Amino acid sequence: MIAVDAPVLAELLTDGPRADAVETALRQALEGGRVVVCDAALAELAASLRNGAEVLAALEEMGIHFSPLESKSALRAGEMQRRQRQREGRARPLSVFLTGAHALLQCDALITFDAAFHRDYFKGLKLVVPGD
């Protein structure tokens, strides 16, 4: 099972400059198995793009499923955000930690543009960067 980060899906849904690379990465991931989006990524998409029903319908049409966070992922996300805030002085949004922890503990990989962040805070998580 492979998770997808909200900015990656937003790029595709808005036909951004990297949409072709995202489409290729998603197609390859779908050929290999189930592709999912977690609660935090779904909420980010609904907040930034369209209403929730349209976002969910678009994801379902692409073959992307919803995968809720388990408590272990939520706890890891909180721990990693606290660590990041202590190191850098200000915290990144909790949603990026929720997405990373979900991918690490509940999935096999994450499709993301932010490989450096995820490598730093989610050691061992396999990353797929569209276009790389």
Give the ranges of each region predicted by the language model:
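Alpha-helical elements of the RecA-like P-loop NTPase motor core of helicases
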Residues: 11, 47, 75, 119-120
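Acidic, PIN/NYN-like endoribonuclease modules and their adjacent C-terminal/linker elements
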Residues: 1, 100-132
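Active-site neighborhoods of divalent-metal-dependent phosphate/nucleic-acid chemistry enzymes
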Residues: 65-113
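Alpha-helix capping/helix-boundary segments
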Residues: 8, 41, 73, 98-99, ...
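A short helix-to-beta-strand connector/capping loop
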Residues: 62-64, 125
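Short, contiguous strand/loop micro-motifs
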Residues: 13, 42, 85-88
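Short, well-structured N-terminal submotif of metal-dependent ribonuclease cores
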Residues: 1-37, 46-60, 128-132
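A general structural signal for well-ordered alpha-helical segments in protein cores
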Residues: 23, 42, 52-55, 74-78, ...
